[in-house]
Amino acid sequence: MILFPAIDLKNGQCVRLEQGDMARATVFNLDPTAQAKSFAAQGFQYLHVVDLDGAFAGKPMNAQAVESMLKVVSMPVQLGGGIRDLATVEAWLSKGIARVIIGTAAVRDPALVKQAAKSFPGRVAVGLDARDGKVAVEGWAESSQVTALEIAQRFEDAGVAAIIFTDIARDGLLKGINWDATIALAEAISIPVIASGGLASIEDVKAMLSPRAHKLEGAIAGRALYDGRLDPAEALALIGAARAA
């Protein structure tokens, strides 16, 4: 089970949004590279990065910040935001990104996901961000008419490494992860699922480690780490103890 600390990039800075709204962004660190180093020093083993500007623009917009982070941390980094074609997938993987996350294109162009997953086994994840049960696209600005499960099922045999499932209604609000919806998705598919959106406290980490969540790969922590509601040492100690058990 992995706890992924999140770095969301907007204008080269490390921010957190509320419910995916770019107008409701809080800057937590002007230097994302320093933030990445801090997470590494705290003992995290896998970093989750999102290029928010890229998600809206449909192409990478914070490449310089991402590349700077890759130079200072040795842990694997997964990256989403603005990855809409195979050339971008290939470019990021060649620069040292461990795993790319395809979101909007997974809805609009499922063939891209299948092609990328086939070309780069184990290095392509799908990001499914749901609002009222339906998947949102274009940096969450638009809602589709399909559910997360419907899209996830399209990729069952495609070699997708993970599904990152976000409940937009909870994202950035510290209301706790929507475990019921996340676990229901994980139980309905064979692809590992990563929980995202609203992780609020150590209670969410305990929920992630509970027997009913055994099909998950882990969860993403954002605002709770930045504002001190989640103690990294306590969270990582719990995960370590669960691993050793």
Curated annotation (Swiss-Prot):
Catalyzed reactions: 1-(5-phospho-beta-D-ribosyl)-5-[(5-phospho-beta-D-ribosylamino)methylideneamino]imidazole-4-carboxamide = 5-[(5-phospho-1-deoxy-D-ribulos-1-ylimino)methylamino]-1-(5-phospho-beta-D-ribosyl)imidazole-4-carboxamide
Annotated family: Belongs to the HisA/HisF family.
Residues at the active site: 8 (proton acceptor), 129 (proton donor)
UniProt xrefs under Gene3D superfamilies: Aldolase class I
Pfam families associated with the record: His_biosynth
E.C. number: 5.3.1.16
Compartments it resides in: Cytoplasm
Gene Ontology BP term (one): L-histidine biosynthetic process
Native species: Rhodopseudomonas palustris (strain HaA2)
Chief site of localization: cytoplasm
Enzyme class of the recorded protein, top EC level: isomerase
Pathway assigned in UniProt: Amino-acid biosynthesis; L-histidine biosynthesis; L-histidine from 5-phospho-alpha-D-ribose 1-diphosphate: step 4/9
Gene that encodes the chain: hisA
GO molecular function term, any single one: 1-(5-phosphoribosyl)-5-[(5-phosphoribosylamino)methylideneamino]imidazole-4-carboxamide isomerase activity
UniProt-recorded name of the protein: 1-(5-phosphoribosyl)-5-[(5-phosphoribosylamino)methylideneamino] imidazole-4-carboxamide isomerase
Keywords: Amino-acid biosynthesis, Cytoplasm, Histidine biosynthesis, Isomerase
Taxonomic path: Bacteria, Pseudomonadati, Pseudomonadota, Alphaproteobacteria, Hyphomicrobiales
One Gene Ontology CC term in the entry: cytoplasm
